[in-house]
Swiss-Prot record:
GO BP terms in the entry: microtubule-dependent intracellular transport of viral material towards nucleus; symbiont entry into host cell
Organism: Snake adenovirus serotype 1
Purpose: Major capsid protein that self-associates to form 240 hexon trimers, each in the shape of a hexagon, building most of the pseudo T=25 capsid. Assembled into trimeric units with the help of the chaperone shutoff protein. Transported by pre-protein VI to the nucleus where it associates with other structural proteins to form an empty capsid. Might be involved, through its interaction with host dyneins, in the intracellular microtubule-dependent transport of incoming viral capsid to the nucleus.
Site feature: Involved in interaction with pre-protein VI: 726
Protein name listed in UniProt: Hexon protein
Amino acid sequence: MEPQREFFHIAGRSAKEYLSENLVQFIQATQNYFNIGEKFRDPYVAPSAGVTTDRSQKLQLRVVPMQIEDNANYYKARFTLNVGDNRLVDLGSSYFDIKGTLDRGPSFKPYGGTAYNPLAPKSAPVNSPFIVGNDTHVVAQLPQTYAAANTGVTEAIQQQVSNVQPNPQDGLPNYSGPEVVDATTKAGLGRVVAEESEGQQFPCLRAYAAPQTAAGDVSTAPIEKTYVNTTNVAGRVSGTMATDVIDWQNPDAHFVDYVDDGRSTSAGNRPNYIGFRDNFIGIMYYNSGSNTGSLSSQTQQLNVVLDLNDRNSELSYQYMLADLTSRWHYFALWNQAVDSYDRHVRIIENDGYEEGPPNLSFPIQGIQNPFSPSSVGTEMTVNTANQTAAATANTVAHIGYGNIPAVEMNLPANLRRTFLYANVAMYLPDTYKFTPPNIDLPANHLSYGYMNGRLPLPNIIDTWTDIGARWSLDVMDTVNPFNHHRNTGLKYRSQLLGNGRHCNFHIQVPQKFFAIKNLLLLPGTYNYEWYFRKDPNMVLQSTLGNDLREDGAQITYNQVNLYVSFFPMNYDTQSELELMLRNATNDQNFSDYLGAVNNLYQIPAGSNTVVVNIPDRSWGAFRGWSFTRLKVTETPRIGATQDPNFEYSGTIPYLDGTFYLSHTFQRCSIQWDSSVPWPGNDRLLVPNWFEIKDPPNQDPEGYNTMQSNLTKDFFFTQMAASYNQGYQGFSYPSCTKHYGFINNFEPMSRQVPVYDATHPNLMAAYLNNPATMPIWNNCGFQQKTSTNALLERCGHAYVANWPFPLTGRDALPNQTTEKKFLVDNYLWQIPFSSNFLNMGTLTDLGQNVMYANSSHSLNMQFTVDPMNEPTYLLLLFGVFDQVVVNQPTRSGISVAYLRLPFASGSAAT
């Protein structure tokens, strides 16, 4: 029997559909005290979640390119898009399906530390020979022993060695404890690396040799024996070693100190995740030049894509996505794992470490004399009457005297110090680093080899730096915090590609250009092509921002297909919709999400002012300004498929929104060619002049806010621009925004001594000349601070002389409070709207008549913190960036672009 289909519909039947009207009214009247509606539910209801409805059904087809062009700089794919009758194409859900191969280059290292002998001491050698002068020194540990009487030559000859025997993992039996081997009656057995081995000899930590067979042997030549004698007996053999000829390798490490082959120290290469950029930024080429993408009908061949160099296609997509959904979820779609950083690295909350009972290390056996094996003897039988003692037969005694020997280390302090060294010190500006002696680094400062080999000065950051404070290192405030191995978004995107240098990729890339990504395309035949960059610095992102082109990364596209979604409709429905959309009154209208014209104004190194002049123009429909600061080295020429001067692969704030220099602005003035003040006289400060932050330790009028040096005036301006909260700015915003102001505003303060002749600034003296080592702290328990912090400790225990105490009974009385703030991921905003405080007489545009109906020139002047490298002022002018799309005939499409007040244009086919 066929089931009654009416009981199996998707949504479930409503009681109103089949109950009598009187019963429905009764249920509604009594439901507040007795809900009887549940009594009338259908016994069979299909699920309403996890099912496919007619609203979600689409037909997705693959379109293969008709023409491709593959050269050194880009890959171009041209598609013929046929939209048949009874079909509508949703270009908003279309995407490019790309297959290819990726060589992430030798600088790719997706982990910290090393994979090879990570438990070995930093300077410990492997069993190997090394040359000192004219002598060959053999350094080896021989853990296996055998009986060897007299000269031991016969026994040594009898020892059987092979490619894998003796195994370097074998040694003394379990539970044997520390044993002093008598080399006159016993001999040792082990393995040693041959002097003839190829490659650079390396410490045991991070040393590697490739296996030759499945047995694990590493020798590339037949095994020979090496004999040694460490006794005073002439002609004796006290050790036998199997000699391996190997190919020395150190895949993930480098030298940090080198004297000779037997005296060197290694460190693991720095982590360097490499993956596609967030939302595949940079892979698709957006520009108004000859290499722009195109969408045209086959009848007239006129491109309807009008992109401009001052449009923000990539950044608009970032902002749109952030407002549509959470940037911290759904990472698998479109590769949109957002760039982030560890706030505890950017802003160090140095609350010290947690103390407890001492951390002690004990001998494995537990019973031992201090730094020597337990004493060996026998049990004794004591005659109390005669007061004599004699050895008890068949007994052995192993005795340690005194307390169990132990060594102590402050494990929490060491863990804290390791965190600060690996996460902060290693990312210091290059000015605060040095090249270890006898270490050769590449001349190119942008290469991974150079960045990897430089070491930080020890005293810049330590466990006592700004202790007790929440403060960012001043020298780190202008360092890109997103270029860090704790960027979880980049790490995720790198891991999506796997953990190997060479990988295959299969990715889906969305269209971001605002006129195409929303378009509903009517029946016809169209040409659609786009350019895909191959420059690894633009397409890929790395942790350290090294020059991936220089370091050998390569991208190869093997296949680019287009997937488009067709709405399956019946003939009548499709025909009706098509007729409506063909009508000019039903044009499709789209806005660029960010709606801004961007301009870059160069700020030379050391300069603290930048002036912007805009000639006469009408300012109708103008919405205001957004601005921040970018480094020249981190900003590519987006008008080129490959910028040869762009030698950097970290985040690109210009495209991805990872702004981090907004805190470097001091003030901004805005002047029109008119005496009418703007934006009015009811602001805290002088009209037309915005003070963003006060100089350090200066706030005579009390304008600062939230324990920082940000002014109340500019705080209110940002609250008005971001959340429509002007003088009500001291209230919680109604929403959170990934790129919002208060979400990213980080105030901080600290106390510091007032330095004078009595209280000298030892840190300044150290930075002036590290060789003087003026700071005494942890003396004897670490390497001296004029050299490499990774070497063994030296010196002796002594009193500390730094930092000055700021708390407790001995607190320095003469202290001053320093305040500052950071506001990353954010563009400063100054709105130009009647809603912003007072704009005078309003028009229907909501703006002052003077600016809406006549032309005026504009002068803006910014005062910024000077930096030691050239930067840009990124200034966004808020415009209405619109496109109107009309498809009057089959295969006919016309597009009109409107950008007020800055530009307009049109394209039609």
